[in-house]
Amino acid sequence: MCQIAGVSRSGFYSYMKSRNDKDSHLNRKEEQDKRDFDLILEAYSYKGYDKGSRGIRMRLLHMGIRMNRKKIIRLMRKYHLFCPIRKANPYRRITRALKSSNYADNLLERHFEDYGPGYVLLTDITYFFYGKERNKAYLSTIKDAFTKQILAYVLSESLEEDFVLETVNHLLRDHSGDIRTNAMIHSDQGCHYTCIRFIDLLKDRNIRQSMSRRGNCWDNAPQESFYGHAKDEIMKYVKEASSFEELEKIIDDYMDYYNSERYQYELSKLSPNEYLEYYKTGIYPLKDLVDENEKTIKKFDTVKANLKRLEEEKDQAAASME
């Protein structure tokens, strides 16, 4: 056969060996891809909440596994695993026609993280259609702008202002020791936040009120972002909820997951609770797997410098009054 083909016997066997080696390499690569994709699937569906490539990578890190994000994206495409696409918060349409004149100034001016935890608190409302009959429920939350923790939330069947007041009361009940002197609550210009009862509640508790400029969602961007991601991750369960009580359980479970295990790149790949602990202790829990983020270290240093300056200004003001 080699004579007919005009090739040497050694050349023929060398060719066959290289082809077998190539096939063997491809088989090994395919097997490795399958093993890696099994890990990706485990991370993707952890606690039942779908994740994108970044969320998967961060979950893998917390499982003690390093995997390049490019590989994760490649394998997701190869095996047709798609992450959810975020949707806009529809609450704006509810309150557009219900404005008042009790607007607060925009004290925040997008300085979300300058003074550490417990200083800037973001609040907003969104709604869900749940169950086959598409019943409507409303969710009010208060989020720490620095740690991204959800500090208080209330789910309601009614859009009456009471459930927004209840959200603030939950915050004061559960986190009174964590709220800093001169803290502010920042919201949009919705009717719930311009009502006299809400304004008086904040004044009674010495919490400053700040509001976004009209029609400018970027002034409350971290809160908007939370609702967008949350809806992507829980909507499949919300649609199947057969009662308001079942929806409450879905929201409760998600809030626990979000604060404890919903990792975020801007939080140095940590969950909100872990990020708060990292800020307090200076100990980075993933240091054996990834390097600490230099931007985060600088941010912590800036916050501490800002707090020191505030204390000095406070002392100077007190001394001038003596």
Would you name each region that the model predicts?
Residues 144-145, 156-160:
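A short acidic/small-residue loop/turn micro-motif
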Residues 7-11, 35, 163, 197, ...:
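Generic alpha-helical secondary structure signal
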